[in-house]
C-alpha cells in the first residue's frame, strides 16, 4: 500500500529549502508542537524558533532549522514561510555553541526587561540550532 502524502514547501526570504511530497512534518507552533499529516484541517499559525522535521517517502527524514515565521496548511499542501531557514547539515556547531554562551552571559548580566527578552530569544535560537545539528548527525 502506498503512503499517503502531500506537498510541502519550506522557504525563507533567501531561498526555497525544500519542495516535495512528504508523509508528515513537525514544527514548533506558537501554541506548541504541531504534527501535520495528509488531511490536516486548514491552519495558519506562527512558528517559533526550532526545527522542521520532515518525513519523506519511505520514512527518510530531513531537519531544517527555522528562526520563526508562519506555517499554512491547506488541503493537499503545506507551506512553511521562515524568517531564516538553514538545513541541518549547513549549521555550524561552533557558532551555535558560541551564540548560546553569549546569550547565557547576557542573561546573567542583563539590565532591564528588553535585554533579558532579547537574550532569551537568542538563547532559544542557539539551542534550537544545536538540537537540529544533533538530530542531523544521528540521522547519518
UniProtKB/Swiss-Prot annotation:
Keyword 4Fe-4S set for record: no
InterPro entries: ATP_F1_dsu/esu_C_sf, ATP_synth_F1_dsu/esu, ATP_synth_F1_dsu/esu_N, ATP_synth_F1_esu_C, ATPsynth_dsu/esu_N
Coiled-coil regions, chain positions: none
MF term (GO), any: proton-transporting ATP synthase activity, rotational mechanism
UniProt keywords, alphabetically: ATP synthesis, Cell inner membrane, Cell membrane, CF(1), Hydrogen ion transport, Ion transport, Membrane, Transport
Membrane topology of this protein: Peripheral membrane protein
Subcellular location: Cell inner membrane
Principal place of residence: membrane
UniProt entry tagged with the keyword Transport: yes
CDD domains: F1-ATPase_delta (cd12152)
GO cellular component: plasma membrane; proton-transporting ATP synthase complex
GO biological process, one term: proton motive force-driven ATP synthesis
Annotated SUPFAM superfamilies: Epsilon subunit of F1F0-ATP synthase C-terminal domain, Epsilon subunit of F1F0-ATP synthase N-terminal domain
Source taxon at top rank: Bacteria
Function recorded in the entry: Produces ATP from ADP in the presence of a proton gradient across the membrane.
The family this protein is said to belong to: Belongs to the ATPase epsilon chain family.
Assembly and oligomerization: F-type ATPases have 2 components, CF(1) - the catalytic core - and CF(0) - the membrane proton channel. CF(1) has five subunits: alpha(3), beta(3), gamma(1), delta(1), epsilon(1). CF(0) has three main subunits: a, b and c.
Name of this protein: ATP synthase epsilon chain
Record organism: Vibrio cholerae serotype O1 (strain ATCC 39315 / El Tor Inaba N16961)
Amino acid at each position: 500500500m502506498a503512503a499517503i502524502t502531500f506537498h510541502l514547501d519550506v522557504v525563507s526570504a533567501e531561498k526555497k529549502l525544500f519542495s516535495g511530497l512528504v508523509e508528515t512534518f513537525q514544527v514548533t507552533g506558537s501554541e506548541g508542537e504541531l504534527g501535520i499529516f495528509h488531511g490536516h484541517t486548514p491552519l495558519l499559525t506562527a512558528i517559533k524558533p526550532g526545527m522542521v522535521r520532515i518525513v519523506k517517502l519511505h520514512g527518510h527524514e530531513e531537519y531544517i532549522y527555522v528562526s520563526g515565521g508562519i506555517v499554512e496548511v491547506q488541503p493537499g499542501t503545506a507551506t512553511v514561510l521562515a524568517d531564516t531557514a538553514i538545513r541541518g547539515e549547513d549549521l555550524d556547531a561552533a557558532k551555535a555553541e558560541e551564540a548560546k554562551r553569549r546569550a547565557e552571559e547576557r542573561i546573567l548580566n542583563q539590565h532591564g526587561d528588553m535585554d533579558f527578552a532579547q537574550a532569551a530569544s537568542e538563547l532559544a535560537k542557539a539551542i534550537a540550532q544545536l538540537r537540529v545539528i544533533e538530530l542531523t548527525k544521528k540521522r547519518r
